[in-house]
Amino acid sequence: MEGRQEDQMNRQEEVEQSNNYDRSVDHARTGRSSWIDNSEINSKWIPQHSLQLEMNNIEGEGSVRENDEEEEEIVVLDPEHPLMKRFQTALKNNFTNQLERLNLDLCEKVVVEKAEAQRRHDLAEEVYMVQEMLARLQASLEVCQETNSEAAAQHRQAEDHLYVVKNQYQDTASQTNVQRLQVLELQSKVDNLALKLLYMQEAKSDLCSDIKAIINASNKAQKERTQTEEQKHQQDIYVERLTNRVEKLLEQISLYDLQLISQTEQTRAAKDSLSEAQLELDSVIVEHRQLLQQWKSSLLMMKRRDEAYTAMQEELRQANDQMLSLDTEIESYKKSITQEEEQNECLTLRLNRGQTDCTTSRKLITHSQNLQEVLQAQLSTYTRILQETENTLSTLHGNLEMHQSALKALRKQMEKVSAVRLDLESQIMNKLQEQLTHNNAAKYSRRMNDKTAVYRREKEAQLIKFENDFNTVTLEGQELATHLDSLLAFQAELEQKSTQRHLLLSSREEEIVKQITDIERKQATISIYNKKIKDIVSSTGHEDLGPLEIHAATLSKELEEVGAKIKECQQLWLWQQGELVRFTQEKQAHSSSVQILQTQLTILQQGKIRRESEMEQDQSELADLDKQIKVLMADMVKLNSLLNKNSDLNHALQQSSNLMETEFRQRLKEAEKDSAETQLKLERLNEEKERLINSLVEAERQVMLWGKRTQLMQETCSAIDSDIGQGDIRTMRAEIHRMEVRYAQLMKQQERLLRDMESVVAKSKTIAVWSEAQARTQAHKQPTHNDYHNTIQSLRRKILQTKKQTEECDGVIAQLEERLGSMTSRLQDKQMHLNNIQNTEAFLSQDLRRLQEIKERNLYRLPVLQTRAKHLHAVKEGRYTPMATGVTALELGTHKQEERLKMVSLTLQRLAQEYPQHHSTLHRMNSILAEHLHGECPNSQ
């Protein structure tokens, strides 16, 4: 029974102890939530016990209060306690081993730091050299920028000077055009006056020749008056025949007068010749009156009329020839128009080809622009990546600031590396800014090159236009020269013919003079013989025909025959004189045309000289522009080389910075891993240490509690009588026995806890050794100086490979640039060809417009001429009634009409200025009115 009771009591105590243990565990969980995981892990090795005893309910409230006070007390063992010596010796050995290991690690780290400091010094020297090179490049770039700015200023000055020269050229061109128009007007006036003067001189010469002929005829008539009286009977019949012939000639003259009037109304030259013919007809009428008195003079005048008639027929023939030549010219114009249309079709085909080439070039340009956009997108992605890297670097800076307390040495190194990185970033930013400035300068130079190319194309187009004008002028000059040669040949032929005619006339005149002298001599002999006959007749009183009389009769007959021959020769001489006059007139006309052509040729030669001077000026300007372009191209080549060098340096710096960043990041990650592992190990060791100390303190407290309780029990036993409370004594003995058993258990537990503490120290030592071994393995894995050297060698190999790749890329870029240059040259050639085609098209369109204007002008003049012909026909038939009678009324009417036409032309000019969209039609109408005004002015005169 007692054994069962003791067992039940032991069970109750164990249950209470387990409940108290659970309460202490809950209190530890609520108090130290951060050590839960480590306590759960370390609970496998370190068992935690908390002993707490309670007195029986029999003992009273005082013993319960004492037990509560004992439970609330926390006993802490002194370090010099004999129980702590074993633990302290183990900890001391552990700490000494750790100190030795840390000293060894510190020596190794000092050596590594020295090597790192040497490497940093070398890297700082390299960075200093790179900075010096960058400064030199910056200075050269500033010099290039200054040269570019100077070149741009010179280019602007050249453009301003060119603009001023263009304005001056336009002003001078407008002035020259106005002066040319004035010269042409004055030349036309001078030509008209010269023609009038020639006509007047010809009329004067004709009148002088007529007067001389009349004087000679009157003298001859006075000499032959005596002879005519004797031969009056024979010539009355001849006079009647002549009167009939004169009447016929008068009828013919009236017909010729009508024809002459119609011809004079058709052309201005015909009008002048008609006025002369009318004057000659008046003189013919006067001479006809004289012919009624003097038949010989009338005969001569009729011969002259015949000559005038032949001259008019010749002029009519010439007019017909001119009409035929105009028809041939019209046909040639039609053929040329068809040829121009074919040429225009060919040009349109070429233009379409050029447009297709332009479309292909535009497609290529769009493709290059797309490539540029893709490259810009890549650049934006690279910038975004750089920003992300900067963000990551900022985050790393934050992490580094968080771990500054634990990693001071790494923090210093990191600060140095970050300073280097900041310097590199500033250098990279400076390089990027320099690259942007280079790009802007390159864009500006490209823009200036494009402007110069456009200006050069314009100048080339102007030069081609000048060459075309020069070629046209040379062709016109050659045509004029050929025409002049033909005219000179024709003039030489005419001169030869005139000389032949003059020789014939001189020979005939000599023969006539000889015959006249013979006739006069014979007449003198006849008169002598007649006197002798008269003397004989007067002496004898009758006529006797002797041989001499018969011979005289025969001689008189011969004289009559000779007189008839003389008359025929005189008629032939007169006809030859008319031919000579006609030839002289043709010669004068040819000489006037030759003079006009010579003046035109001189004008064209002056224009040629002026255009050659302009072309030389343009060529000199083009040479200057070529020189400037070459200088700019050399500057561009230098800038491109500098840009390539800067890009290579930037690329190398970026690669080195990227490599340093990657290495630094790897080292940071490894250091962070090491620091995290060491922190975890330290936290675990601290937790284990605290738990062990707590368990030791609690065990010591339990031992002290049990000592106090045993002392109390002994005192109670001594105080209690032997007689009183034997049952209680038994229970107390049982309790004491239980306490002794419990004490033995606690001593065992204390021994076990001490062993656990020693094992914890040993385990911490093994953990430290294991962590050191792992750190050493990781340290072995980390790169040494040889590894760095190997990595540098591999990086150098990679750099060489990248340099080779960049050289290959440069070669490809050079090939592409050559292809681009060839494409640009081809585009420029095609552009020049297209400009030539456009210039020829514009020139042909101007010619076509001019021909259309001439056609419209002719179509406008045709009904006017038709109405004029109708009016002339009405005048011929006598049905025309004039609007104004008298010179003053006619002048007033013409003046009014001219004023009306001037008002209409002014209104048309104003409308053309107000409505430029209808400028062509209004200008055409205005030109027709101007021609009408210019045509009416000489007619009115």
Curated annotation (Swiss-Prot):
Disruption phenotype: Defects are the cause of the lok phenotype, a phenotype related to primary ciliary dyskinesia (PCD). PCD is characterized by curly-tail down phenotype, laterality defects and pronephric cysts, but without defects in sensory cilia and without the presence of hydrocephalus. GO terms for biological process: axonemal dynein complex assembly; axoneme assembly; cilium assembly; cilium movement; determination of left/right symmetry; embryonic heart tube morphogenesis; epithelial cilium movement involved in determination of left/right asymmetry; epithelial cilium movement involved in extracellular fluid movement. Residues 130-154, 210-430, 548-572, 609-765, 814-856, 895-915 form a coiled coil. Residues 1-31 are annotated as: Disordered. It is found in: Cytoplasm; Cell projection, Cilium. Expressed in tissues that contain motile cilia, including Kupffer's vesicle, the floorplate, the pronephric tubules and the otic vesicle. Residues 1-14 have a biased composition (Basic and acidic residues). Its main location: cytoplasm. Pfam families: BRE1. Keywords: Cell projection, Ciliopathy, Cilium, Coiled coil, Cytoplasm, Primary ciliary dyskinesia. One of its GO terms (cellular component) is cilium. Belongs to the CCDC40 family. Required for assembly of dynein regulatory complex (DRC) and inner dynein arm (IDA) complexes, which are responsible for ciliary beat regulation, thereby playing a central role in motility in cilia and flagella. Probably acts together with ccdc39 to form a molecular ruler that determines the 96 nanometer (nm) repeat length and arrangements of components in cilia and flagella. This is Coiled-coil domain-containing protein 40. It comes from Danio rerio (Zebrafish). The lineage of its organism: Eukaryota, Metazoa, Chordata, Craniata, Vertebrata. The gene is ccdc40.
